[in-house]
Amino acid sequence: MDWGALQTILGGVNKHSTSIGKIWLTVLFIFRIMILVVAAKEVWGDEQADFVCNTLQPGCKNVCYDHYFPISHIRLWALQLIFVSTPALLVAMHVAYRRHEKKRKFIKGEIKSEFKDIEEIKTQKVRIEGSLWWTYTSSIFFRVIFEAAFMYVFYVMYDGFSMQRLVKCNAWPCPNTVDCFVSRPTEKTVFTVFMIAVSGICILLNVTELCYLLIRYCSGRSKKPV
């Protein structure tokens, strides 16, 4: 996956975000994407090759691994980041649409007095108001939903956030109940708890930003003359 391209796109959204939104994006890239790309892959490595069972029965090890780890932690985190980042792309599309409309009006001469040239339209910060407010607020709401949903899926799928050292498996074609050992369980548990904690921080930041936008919206409406 090209994380650099994603950073470029979200960096454009960050320009029009609130201060809390900028903090969220910093946490997303430094504490999640960078950790995932640089450190987590080294810790997990070839998970299936390091998963050892005390049997020589062909296929038993693969079946047991698939039973206890239906989706790799790395792939699940990558999928989570894609879902969490997608709502921000909607904001980027909305901002691009607004700029396109302003360019069209500028070329027609409808708003020539507001801008010197088209380059000024490209660099102007778009205010979060009107229909963009709804798009931006909706994107934050869906980010919270996706974060919470993936945390729940993670907890249910792996039966908690800690990595077991030993798992017992009796799935076919294993001849009986066999013992399987997970490599570096403590290190993996630390990374898992860290990633879950950062997800919780992101949820807190998103909820805080959502409350801030709602309060600002309500206070703005109350100031308008009846």
From Swiss-Prot:
Transmembrane segments: 21-40, 74-94, 136-156, 190-210
Membrane topology (UniProt): Multi-pass membrane protein
Role description: Structural component of gap junctions. Gap junctions are dodecameric channels that connect the cytoplasm of adjoining cells. They are formed by the docking of two hexameric hemichannels, one from each cell membrane. Small molecules and ions diffuse from one cell to a neighboring cell via the central pore.
Residue ranges within the lipid bilayer that do not cross it: 2-13
Protein location: Cell membrane; Cell junction, Gap junction
Stated name of the protein: Gap junction beta-2 protein
Gene Ontology cellular-component terms listed: connexin complex; plasma membrane
Cytoplasmic side: 14-20, 95-135, 211-226
BP GO annotations: cell-cell signaling; gap junction-mediated intercellular transport; sensory perception of sound
Extracellular-side segments: 41-73, 157-189
Organism: Pongo pygmaeus
